[in-house]
Amino acid sequence: MTIALGIAPIGWTNDDMPDLGKEVTFEQAIDEMALAGYQGTEVGNKYPKDPVVLKHYLDLRHLKIASAWFSAFLTTKPYEETEAAFIKHRDFLHAMGAKVIVVAEQGHSVQGMLDKSVFDDKPHFTDEEWQRLATSLERLGDRAHEVGMQIVYHHHMGTGVQTTAEIDKLMAMTDPDKVSLLFDTGHLVLSGEDPLTIFDRYHDRIKHIHFKDVRPEQAQQERTDHLSFLQGVKNGMFTVPGDGMIDFKPIWEAIQKQHYDGWIVVEAEQDPAKANPFEYALKAKHYLDTIMTIPHAV
């Protein structure tokens, strides 16, 4: 088993709401990631776009790139348009030494809309859209394989693949050799799903993991007040492992049992003015150190 522990930059700066953490520099974020003891990170909007420059900054801090988010529009735009953007994204990540590409379908998504409930207004794909999505994801998987990489699909609040039933459908419709799965604890729990059920069902397809925790009071408010995803983030519905309602110990035990090989990335979209990113990075690291034993790094 080969695992590395990383942390996403969204606790420092938020790509969907640039005002959150606008004062935080790229250098501050990666300095604090390294100081907190993480081995790598995912790519944020403030990161240098030149792989040579980015690698220089990260090498100084002994950090690596685990992956980066890619927004696909396979249900709403011509495939060729998404593929062209994907190849550029793929080549950047390949130059950075990443092995997986995080893909999430944004066709009809409400995750970036302030006035749309993440539950009431989430999209539901038609049969034709499901087929387009599945076929097109397999084609992107082929493009990833050209450079020895693979895509990992990110189930996400406010999108057409949010629930267990929707994850099941996507997995059933796609070739396991071409489409892998990203396992995100926070999005599953917030959606009302059981993370262990998903992990046990798809452990052989899970090639990337996000450890995100959920605050119970804010999670309930997300439903009862019909809040949008972005409103929920500002309200503090997400936090780091060890600070919310999720017990990560049985999840870690399941990960060990199945000999998972890859990155575990700590994530928590929060307002850095309310939740100091460095303090929360340390909080997560200290908590995970009490339940996890990582044999060696990727």
Predicted regions, residues:
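N-terminal pre-domain/capping segments
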Residues: 1-100, 123, 127-128, 134-135, ...
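Non-cysteine beta-strand/loop elements that form the S-adenosyl-L-methionine
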Residues: 4-8, 66, 101-106, 204-215, ...
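Active-site beta-loop-alpha junctions enriched in small/polar residues
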Residues: 10-12, 44-46, 70-74, 106-108, ...
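Acidic/histidine-rich catalytic cores of soluble enzymes
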Residues: 41, 134-245, 295-298
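Active-site acidic/histidine proton-transfer and metal-coordination neighborhood
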Residues: 79-181
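C-terminal/domain-terminus segments
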Residues: 261-290
